Amino acid sequence: MGRLYVVATPVGNLEDITVRAIKILLSVPVIACEDTRRTGMLIKILKERYSDFLYSHPNPPPKLGGGNQREGVKKYLSVRDWNEAEQVEKVMQLLETDDVALVSDAGTPLLSDPGYKIVREARKRNFEVMSVPGPFAGAAAVSISGLPTNKVMFWGFLPKKWDLEPGLTHVIYESPVRLNKTLKKIEMKYPEAEIVIACELTKIHEKIWKHKNGEDEKVRGEVTVLVNFGRSW
């Protein structure tokens, strides 16, 4: 019987990946991911950069479970929001004999990414589910925002209908195309709110700044919006 490893991957800077994550990803025979090409490229880079180091280390990657392999072809299984329900059973069947790593395109899986149904079913069937923690864009943005951190609400992408509770720092993901529309809605509903925007975290063009009401923002790449009003501190 295999294990399910929920593995965090970098949100931008590859050097943020943990040694343990590298060991797991290079050892498991099966990886459930969003974009198989993107994850395949990540594995290729990890092998090129770290394979020799890891396997010459006094503490090399441990033998995991069924199907453990250093070399050879890995199986990649695409898991998206629209097909996760039908992929659950495939992952469960693979876990009967093999270890499986679950990753997202970037950051910590399940947080605004698919994977919840797989983890839930694996636990229901008594498979061992292991956390391999690491980068999370929402937490990274909060930690450098200067906003209160004692009470934080993570939204991911906002639903169609939403209200923000006072006294919390709200963490919102948004696309560059919809950013200004969302900012205007927040300004109208909560004119006293303090808004901080973080873009391209850990990348070359990383930027974080306080938004001024009424201004249009020109951004690119991944965007995290942080909102606080009625401060808790």
Residue spans for each PLM region:
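Class I SAM-dependent methyltransferase SAM-binding "motif I" and its flanking Rossmann-like core
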Residues: 112-166
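Glycine/small-residue-rich loop that forms an oxyanion/phosphate-binding "nest" at active or ligand-binding sites
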Residues: 54, 75-136
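Alpha-helix capping/helix-boundary segments
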Residues: 37-39, 108, 137, 178
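Short amphipathic alpha-helix with an adjacent loop that forms part of the alpha/beta core around
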Residues: 88-95, 162-166, 214-217
